[in-house]
Amino acid sequence: MYVAHLSLHDFRSYATAEVELSPGVTAFIGRNGQGKTNLVEAIDYLSRLSSHRVASDAPLVRAGADQAVVRAAVVRDGRTAVLEVELNPGRSNRARVNRSPLPRARDLVGLVRTVVFSPEDLTLVKGDPADRRRFLDDLLVLRVPRLAGVRADYDRVLRQRNTLLKTARKGGFARKGGFARKGGFAPLGPPEGRPEGPPEGRTGGSATSGPPSRSVALDTLAVWDAHLARTGAELLAERLALVEALRPYVGKAYETVARGATRDDAEIDYKPSFDLEGRTGRDDLVEALLAEVERRRGDELDRGVSLVGPHRDELLLTLGHGSPDSRLPVKGYASHGESWSFALALRLAAYDLLRADGDDPILILDDVFAELDTERRAQLADLVAGAEQVLVTAAVAADVPAGLAGARFAVGNGEVLREQ
């Protein structure tokens, strides 16, 4: 798989850009702020419909423009398809394949696959659990594109349920009074000093007219519990399976990247927000999630937030030998070099797993060599040199290892010029 042509309109710093590409290694060389990363970011966006640099689409649209367009001719198994996404901040994005509109923009996900190495990768090791969950989910969606819908459904359910919990909390639900019951909750009596029913001057139960009655709120919460368990169980089951598939690749990649620098083994383990007691099947996980939600009901009502589900899980990264209890967490214990080696191992493992699935994803090395010492630069270059397409960005040509010789573009002053 490789990108043969990239076309940008009002994307980041580019009013327009047209770049012809080829298989093998291509390096974009330019000073910081000249737009070299914007080029590879656009290709990665087509892969995941999200940026590895920012959380929202708004910064991706050039200042003063209403929308941005990214279009690429992608060659896969000898066939060329033109993929296009139209970014509309505040509105729905639109996607096309060979100029034919897709029902939903997310249907574009997975048609081109990328693996990005960037300076931000250190957050996979040193950042919050959310960074590691995103790493897993992005890889899940690349392998099984329909899971983009599952993840979107879970996020929607979580937002709705949190809103309802906050409403219930403001409405005066309390721990005492025996609120829990199987399949839902018994409504409590009014808080001390407050009459039963909606606040004075308000009627009904919409979000705009005031909080719903307690029985309505609790019955509605039971419905969202079921949605949370259903979508959460599917996402959780897929993550568990992914970690099992990824684990041997991480260990092998770390051993290669940190060659001679350590005798420790790199391990990854999935840590759910509660004890699964060995359950991994979807139906069993649905029951487990529902039971845990019921057990934590009081805490959730007290805090007004969902405390159970995949959004609270963690991907544990450890170094050492033996059982998980005998290994040390990378975050907080590993040196800077070990942390970088682990971050690179995660990306390399993702690349190797996608290749094992039968696809050779596009590798993007975004300013990553400037962060590595000479030995790690050479090791990484050796590992990725055989990929069908490798896109590299660097501030100076000297940052690109000799093992990654190939086409080069000079990027500056809004232009992308191929060097002869």
UniProtKB/Swiss-Prot annotation:
It is found in: Cytoplasm. One of its GO terms (molecular function) is ATP binding. The lineage of its organism: Bacteria, Bacillati, Actinomycetota, Actinomycetes, Propionibacteriales. ATP binds at residues 30-37. Belongs to the RecF family. It holds the Pfam family SMC_N. It comes from Nocardioides sp. (strain ATCC BAA-499 / JS614). This is DNA replication and repair protein RecF. The RecF protein is involved in DNA metabolism; it is required for DNA replication and normal SOS inducibility. RecF binds preferentially to single-stranded, linear DNA. It also seems to bind ATP. One of its GO terms (biological process) is DNA synthesis involved in DNA repair. Residues 175-214 are annotated as: Disordered. One of its GO terms (cellular component) is cytoplasm. Keywords: ATP-binding, Cytoplasm, DNA damage, DNA repair, DNA replication, DNA-binding, Nucleotide-binding, SOS response. It comes from the Bacteria. Its main location: cytoplasm.
